[in-house]
């Protein structure tokens, strides 16, 4: 049985196939070996934030903005023995392109162990993209699962000057001991290392604490990564009813920033399901989702790249205008408008 499982999880193709959308203002590309967003850049400033990838030779491996599903983090010991991979199967299997027309595309993947299917629809509009993912439980039984977006930025976009901002609020360090890791509680952008405050907006040569999770109290969550010298902002917007958690991962190599995860999802506790189900909630937010037999659940987010008119030290707020736009305001008072692709949500 285990041999069969390993065959099912093996890459179906050795050469990566990429699905690319290009509207003349921006281009965005998805690697069908694993389904990750691996390239997003403006035509007049060709800098791709999504250069990070895990080491290895497998065609389907973690890279760029990948999806974690049916879990975030490690399986249980029994699941590991059954062949369940870290962060779930969805970024370890081949995706199949369903269609592509102009600036829209559809792709799909099946998770043979989890018995889940996912269909992703991407619509590129200006320098933003709307991504909708519909998850279907193919089993005759309901089950708990998790779905965490794992955008991971890397050099050369990522360096010591990049600033991360968000409307996240209460949080906790994943390194805090169970069963109550939410104590001590911190508030974005603060974290604690050995009892001393750490500002997670910046990353220089010390990644600790390397994973800190926060909840968002507003109707919509947002997170941005701003490069001051390049005047370039990468950002995400999502509905917190769908993704209540923001998880910040930081990684350094050779004393330099190497990866920053801007991870939003259905859970904020990096533990196997036996622990998640016992814990249940933190800060009143659930640590897992439930999908019934044959049910389909959809979630969506907006990703954008914008160039600022002048250098800035960070994004102070992102607000919805009600007239089809988001307004990004810098700490210096600059305003940049982004089309609201989540309108009506």
Mark where each language-model region is.
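Surface-exposed acidic/polar loop and edge beta-strand patches at domain peripheries
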Residues: 17-130, 138-345
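Positively charged n-region of N-terminal signal peptides that target proteins for export
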Residues: 1-4
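Hydrophobic h-region of N-terminal signal peptides that target proteins for export
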Residues: 9-16
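Intrinsically disordered and other compositionally biased segments
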Residues: 8-9, 137
């Amino acid at each position: 049985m285990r041999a069969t499982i390993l065959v099912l999880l093996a890459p179906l193709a050795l050469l990566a196939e990429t699905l690319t959308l290009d509207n003349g203002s921006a281009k965005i590309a998805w690697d069908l070996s694993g389904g990750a967003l691996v390239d997003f850049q403006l035509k007049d400033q060709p800098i791709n934030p999504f250069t990070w990838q895990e080491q290895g030779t497998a065609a389907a491996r973690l890279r760029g903005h990948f999806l974690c599903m049916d879990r975030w983090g490690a399986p249980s010991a029994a699941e590991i023995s059954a062949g369940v991979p870290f962060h779930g199967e969805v970024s370890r299997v081949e995706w199949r392109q369903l269609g592509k027309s102009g600036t829209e595309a559809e792709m799909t993947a099946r998770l043979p162990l989890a018995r889940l299917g996912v269909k992703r629809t991407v619509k590129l509009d200006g320098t933003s993209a709307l991504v909708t993912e519909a998850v279907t439980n193919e089993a005759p039984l309901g089950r708990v699962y998790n779905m965490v977006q794992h955008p991971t930025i890397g050099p050369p976009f990522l360096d010591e000057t990049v600033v991360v901002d968000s409307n996240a609020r209460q949080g906790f360090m994943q390194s805090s001991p169970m069963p109550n890791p939410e104590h001590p509680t911190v508030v974005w952008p603060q974290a604690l290392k050995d009892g001393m405050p750490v500002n997670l907006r910046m990353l220089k040569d010390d990644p600790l604490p390397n994973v800190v999770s926060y909840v968002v109290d507003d109707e919509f969550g947002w997170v941005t990564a701003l490069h001051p010298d390049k005047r370039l902002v990468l950002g995400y917007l999502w509905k917190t009813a769908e993704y209540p958690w923001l998880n910040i991962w930081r990684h350094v190599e050779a004393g330099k920033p190497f990866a920053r995860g801007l991870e939003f999802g259905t859970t904020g506790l990096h533990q196997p399901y036996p622990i998640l189900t016992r814990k249940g909630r933190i800060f009143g937010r659930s640590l897992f989702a439930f999908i019934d037999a044959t049910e389909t659940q959809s979630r969506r987010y907006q990703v954008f790249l914008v160039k600022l008119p002048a250098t800035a030290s960070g994004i102070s707020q992102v607000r919805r205008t009600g007239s089809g736009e988001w307004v990004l305001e810098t700490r210096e008072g600059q305003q940049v408008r982004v089309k609201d692709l989540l309108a009506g949500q």
